[in-house]
Amino acid sequence: MRQETRFKFNAYLSRVAELNGIDAGDVSKKFTVEPSVTQTLMNTMQESSDFLTRINIVPVSEMKGEKIGIGVTGSIASTTDTAGGTERQPKDFSKLASNKYECDQINFDFYIRYKTLDLWARYQDFQLRIRNAIIKRQSLDFIMAGFNGVKRAETSDRSSNPMLQDVAVGWLQKYRNEAPARVMSKVTDEEGRTTSEVIRVGKGGDYASLDALVMDATNNLIEPWYQEDPDLVVIVGRQLLADKYFPIVNKEQDNSEMLAADVIISQKRIGNLPAVRVPYFPADAMLITKLENLSIYYMDDSHRRVIEENPKLDRVENYESMNIDYVVEDYAAGCLVEKIKVGDFSTPAKATAEPGA
């Protein structure tokens, strides 16, 4: 590490210590991040991603408890004949069918090599570059685990699960576990026998088009009071709709430079719903829901951190952890359709023998 880099890096460590009310020398020992610092970090992370701004990132004080129930569940309009002594009954619109959450520890550990710090030290925004590098990767990992996580292993294996499948139970797996009746992954006949292990869309398939599939799923897997909700969207995998339907609609910033424009909205609607593409969503699936129906809960005093140098490997190591849970606020407000295969499934015409053959 160059002398200029050392000076700026020490100033960064002093700033981290100041924000968390500890001595600069204690940054290399595990410390609890101040809740206000965690809140600022989570807000900044949310603002760094268009997708994360559209969902809920919620601090909770307990490791486990009842969902907050963000958004109204069902209708609340009613009539009551009070003249006959009947009292009006208010509806608890936060009452949910499956209403529990449980935050578990997720680690965000990484290192920065000395030569990278030496490069960043040439710029005035040295501390900002370190912070932004952390926030960008954490933002992407929150999204990746949310859409691909199927379990929480005691010790995760990134080589076997490159999409963070074993880090946490994400939103899609929550649907599979908690609301399997709202998940479509195969085709059955009227007697419940499986006729296809995948959902075929196209000529000769189970559905003539993606529009027909979305309309059928919406009508049969989502509760009636949500079917006409103006905030419903279809989060669609990249294999299902051609790239030409997804021009970038965010004109305020350059998508090639900023993570914030990571939600791409199609000009084409599917089943009369806006089609949305987000990072790391499974390529052969669709999630029909309101984006505000998806939440990340984090325990606000669970944030732990330690920053230490490892000169034997010429790098600075940052160990960070937080207890979080991926939450679907109301399963009735959405459904998951997966194992979708688009193509031509019509029976090939039999070859005819040529005359004289």
From Swiss-Prot:
Protein name, per record: Capsid proteins
Highest taxon of source: Viruses
Record keyword ATP-binding present: no
Subcellular location field: Virion
Record's keyword annotation contains Ribosomal protein: no
Modification after translation, per record: N*, H1 and H2 all derive from full-length N protein by N-terminal processing.
Main localization (coarse): virion
Cellular component annotations (GO), alphabetically ordered: viral capsid
